[in-house]
């Protein structure tokens, strides 16, 4: 019976994968991780990977699939942080959903298109693919009906 336990432990160890992302500054890490590492906890929970800050690196551990998913999400969210955008729970969950569907590139594409500016100069951007499709339809067509 001890041999079975040893084999299970070694199989589990072999299945563990690691990935790393490099952070340019501590400010980026703080903005990405959020208050009391709340964002980090959401990314971990949504991807199933363990995320550890080590100096200027973010080390990601988990199964090959979980580690790759978490790395993709972290890298895309770092681009968001570098653009000066805020990262919150809903944005993280949406980014994870897009990455799971294989549409990780759309995470940064959504944020690049400014729809309008407020009176105070803040940018209004699409937050979901549905909003982006709607705005593109408004730009292309004379009449657009929105339901819902």
Residues covered by each model-derived region:
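Extended, non-globular interaction scaffolds
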Residues: 2-3
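Flexible hinge/switch segments at interdomain interfaces of large molecular machines
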Residues: 6-17, 111-113
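Short glycine-/aliphatic-rich beta-strand segments at the starts of folded cytosolic domains
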Residues: 11-31
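Short amphipathic alpha-helix segments
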Residues: 28-45
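N-terminal assembly/transducer modules of large multi-domain enzymes
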Residues: 45-47, 54
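Interdomain "pre-motor" coupling segment immediately N-terminal to P-loop NTPase/helicase cores
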Residues: 52-111
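Pre-Walker A segment
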Residues: 102-147
